[in-house]
């Protein structure tokens, strides 16, 4: 087993990823509020935490991955009105779109994808307990969390509580005892509502994740809690506060946050009208290009998207996949090597150790390129050592798999192999017109 260390926003230190008493490692990532298609900022955590999950598994961890759907929200109500469909129809539509996005980006399905609407009874019971224990209070059918009861408040975002109060007063609510107190239950007559001891209404966003973690983990606790940097405050801070109130311990051992997205060196925002939907980028460039860009930058650093970044990614991917495809083809049409193949354990171990050091994907990619250099040298030999070539190809495929990238392992049919041999014969016999036509067909079939 290779121990994995990750940067914890709470302690500002690299911490070793642990396990519970059953040797399980729980990873929870805040999922989308499903009222629209995901933009590229929403897609970054999808890819980052998929790479983390693959890394943990490869390093010997038994990972339980949970990522929720927020299918109750004011934005959902407004979007449903705009599209003139029910809230259920709207959320179903965008959950389906998100699942397609996950597939297009080669992201593994979570072990659990809980929805808020499926956990309403548990959410109400959770809030009841907080009210009973004086961690929450009721005002005119609304329920608020009493932040003053949590001495650790501000520890995830590393903010001073007095400074937070000053900022919170800008949007002060006269119902609250404290400007920092946040909504656990909202009384409303708009949109879908649920009966509760306090009013007809719906839950606050910050409560939903805590309850879903409580429902799916043994002790309302995960080893890693992930999300975008923008969720540190108030969302993750408020989740943590409720965990202290409910079970008297932190919600997570490690709070892991990925960096934000810039478009042409400007922050992506609705006001600048520079939002880019992930599905549109995939339609233009493909999911593999997006994953390469994400893997080329450390997960905590911001990523700048521009035409130059995409062009560089395409160029680098050509350097990766052209020799791999050549190797795969030669192994099948010119050798008798059988699958599955062995790998270079030493090189693969170095690759995993790079990722185990706070998901250092840049270093991991440099190790991938070292193996590609070896593969290229083998391809250029007058007499190819097919065992060495096969081992190198398989090692690269293993590395690409951990990065969530496409592997090169197509098995060609006898008919396809014969077409390749026919193309070579045309070239040898200087039948260039026929060779050119057949080459186009081989490219179309993905053989060349």
Name each model-derived stretch.
Residues 1-33, 50, 121-327:
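Alpha-helical recognition segments enriched in aromatics with Gly/Pro capping
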Residues 57, 103, 131-132, 256, ...:
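Alpha-helix C-terminal capping/helix-coil junction sites
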Residues 81-86, 111-117, 199, 228:
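The substrate-binding groove and active-site-proximal loops of carbohydrate-active enzymes
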Residues 61, 135, 447:
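Short phosphate-binding/catalytic loops that engage adenosine nucleotides
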Residues 69-73, 95-98, 108-123, 141-150:
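Short, glycine/charge-rich beta-strand/loop segments that flank catalytic centers
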Residues 267-269, 275-448:
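Structural preference for alpha-helix termini/caps and helix-kink/transition segments
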Residues 11-16, 20-106:
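N-terminal, positively charged nucleic-acid-binding surface of large information/translation enzymes
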